[in-house]
From Swiss-Prot:
Its EC number is 1.3.1.14. Binds 1 FMN per subunit. GO terms for molecular function: dihydroorotate dehydrogenase (NAD+) activity. It comes from the Bacteria. Keywords: Cytoplasm, Flavoprotein, FMN, NAD, Oxidoreductase, Pyrimidine biosynthesis. The active site is at C132 (nucleophile). This is Dihydroorotate dehydrogenase B (NAD(+)), catalytic subunit. It is found in: Cytoplasm. Substrate binds at K47, N71, A72, I73, G74, L75, N129, N194, T195. It catalyses: (S)-dihydroorotate + NAD(+) = orotate + NADH + H(+). Its cofactor is FMN.
């Protein structure tokens, strides 16, 4: 048997392997170029971009927790115009699909961002963040109400012909209802899960540790929740699902594929090991070789229940 085929396709975007980087954990790509080969991963997903630059939340805004971390960065970013002028030129030189994550505080901002990105051939697709739990206005509302989510996705769909991935929040009662609303509105793929809203308290000070009070929980602690939600959504929709949540190893990634994910995103692992995404992709290839599996796509949704 020759080398196994790790390629997958998500919303018309061809990936050399199923491993993408999760937004907010990989900067704009260049920051990690010294630590791994950007042409050995499936796709680069940028930090979440807004219309105007954003300073983010006051510190402290990160705290380690058992099995993960809480972050309340507050979607700090350079803004869409600076991204296009300063960050995109480097990404043009990399032969790996670039997917831009975007978020707005209003419906109109989502549409405006999509229109600006629609004209850029080097942007392979958009990932719409309707689910970030640490912003005091905007995202949380869109991400937890099916009608609001439908409105946002519909507007972005009208504003671009690019492949459209919608990132879902786990902070909902019925994730399948949210998934269906986004697909009905025109999503080409769904990525899940974003972080779970959490809190950490300092007993001595009797105060929250994070200046923002609450933050997003990520890392291995959320993996069982993520697997369950990916499995539920993958059975309910006809578009590709991208699994996110506590993926630290190739084993984790392959478990998400069995649950129904076509691709995965690596997030918190990038902070612990900046070469994690490449290491996970290589580990997946090794697993296929050792188990005589010719094509990684054989594993998608192959969970025996």
């Amino acid at each position: 048997m020759g080398k196994p085929d790790l390629s997958v396709e998500v919303a018309g975007i061809k990936l050399r392997n199923p491993v993408m980087t999760a937004s907010g954990t990989f900067g704009y790509g260049k920051e990690f170029a010294d630590y791994l080969d950007l042409e050995k991963i499936g796709a680069i997903i940028t930090k979440g971009l807004s219309i105007r630059p954003k300073a983010g939340n006051p510190t402290p805004r990160i705290v380690e927790t058992p099995g993960g971390m809480l972050n309340a960065i507050g979607l700090q970013n350079v803004g869409i115009d600076a991204f296009i002028q300063e960050k995109l030129p480097f990404l043009r030189t990399v032969n790996t699909p670039v997917i831009v994550n975007l978020y707005g505080n209003t419906l109109e901002e989502y549409g405006e961002l999509a229109e600006k990105l629609d004209k850029l051939p080097e942007v392979a697709g958009l990932e719409v963040n309707i689910s970030c739990p640490n912003v005091k206005q905007g995202g949380i509302v869109f991400g937890t109400d099916p009608n609001a989510a439908y409105e946002v996705v519909s507007l972005v769909r009208e504003s671009t012909i690019k492949p459209l991935i919608v990132k879902l929040s786990p902070n909902v009662t019925n994730v399948v209802e949210m998934a269906n609303a986004c697909v009905d509105a025109g999503a080409d793929a769904l990525s899940l899960i974003n972080t779970l809203t959490g809190m950490a308290i300092d007993l001595q000070k009797r105060r929250p540790i994070l200046a923002n009070m609450t933050g997003g929980l990520s890392g291995p602690a959320i993996k069982p929740v993520a697997l369950r939600m990916v499995w539920q959504v993958a059975q309910a929709v006809k578009v590709p699902v991208i699994g996110i949540g506590g993926i630290m190893t190739a084993t984790d990634a392959l478990e998400f594929m069995l649950a129904g994910a076509t691709a995965v995103q690596v997030g918190t692992a990038n902070f612990l090991d900046p070469s994690a995404a490449q290491t996970i992709a290589e580990g997946m290839e090794t697993y296929l070789e050792e188990n005589g599996i010719a094509d990684v796509k054989e594993l998608i949704g192959a969970l025996i229940t």
